[in-house]
């Protein structure tokens, strides 16, 4: 089995893992960013990102923030349209985009994650390992050994960012799913969806039969929409 030595191994190359890797780059550390999939890859998501996401990109790097502005598979969205069980409508606009680093937007998760992953992969000291599903982890004499089917990673630190179904969370902690405080959702993409708010407000529909859940309809580029129930 191939052995690779690093200062930090980051398990998961989604937004959390990429943010960690990006911020650790150029700090004199050798970083492994490991993911079980190959990018671009999809994740079930509502696809709406608030203005704070844009703000965090500015705090991380002005270059990263500028590249996000040029990322063209997104549409700006700076408000919410609520639909009540009695079909009444309420539109709430967020703070003006120019006051919050450019405001929020909606982008398919497959596109946004691939953008962030690609930007992170350009940074120095970051070594990318795709299609490497982690199968074991041990803490051995001041070093952590993380193994996939073909590679053994040795590191001083392991950052766990492997998502909602985290193998490492189950392996390293006693955390369990609290069924009384757990929710799930379904999502589908639709084409030729029209008549959104002129400023692309996301829509949250609350219907008696599904409370406390709700239906969401979020606009996407090209007259597409992310429609889900959660």
Where are these regions (language model features)?
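Glycine-rich FAD pyrophosphate-binding loop
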Residues: 25-45
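A conserved beta-strand/loop capping segment in the N-terminal third of enzymes
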Residues: 58-112
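Residues forming the Rossmann-fold NAD(P)(H) cofactor-binding site
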Residues: 18, 114
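Rossmann-fold NAD(P)-dependent oxidoreductase module
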Residues: 23, 115, 119
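Conserved Rossmann-like nucleotide-cofactor binding loop
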Residues: 16, 39, 165
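Short, well-ordered alpha-helix to beta-strand connector turns
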Residues: 6, 28, 155-156
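Beta1/beta-strand and adjacent pyrophosphate-binding region of the FAD-binding site
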Residues: 2-16, 32
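Predominantly flavin-linked oxidoreductase catalytic cores and closely associated redox partners
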Residues: 119-230
């Amino acid at each position: 089995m191939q052995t690779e030595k690093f200062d930090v191994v980051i398990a998961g190359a989604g937004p959390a893992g990429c943010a960690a890797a990006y911020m650790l780059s150029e700090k004199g550390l050798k970083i492994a960013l490991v993911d079980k999939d190959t990018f671009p890859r999809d994740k079930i998501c509502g696809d709406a990102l608030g203005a704070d996401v844009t703000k965090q990109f500015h705090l991380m790097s002005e270059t990263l923030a500028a590249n996000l502005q040029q990322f063209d598979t997104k549409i700006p969205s700076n408000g919410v349209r609520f639909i009540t069980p009695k079909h009444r409508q309420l539109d709430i606009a967020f703070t003006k985009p120019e006051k919050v680093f450019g405001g929020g937007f909606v982008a398919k998760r497959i596109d946004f994650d691939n953008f962030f992953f690609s930007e992170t992969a350009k940074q120095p000291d970051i070594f990318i390992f795709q299609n490497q599903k982690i199968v074991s982890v041990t803490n051995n004499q001041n070093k952590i050994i993380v193994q996939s089917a073909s590679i053994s990673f040795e590191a001083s630190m392991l950052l766990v960012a492997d998502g909602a179904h985290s193998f490492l969370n189950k392996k390293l902690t006693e955390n369990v799913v609290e069924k009384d405080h757990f929710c799930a959702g379904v999502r589908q993409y639709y084409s030729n969806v029209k008549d959104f708010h002129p400023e692309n407000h996301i829509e949250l529909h609350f219907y008696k039969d599904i409370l406390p859940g709700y239906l969401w309809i979020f606009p996407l580029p090209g007259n597409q929409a992310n429609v889900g129930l959660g």
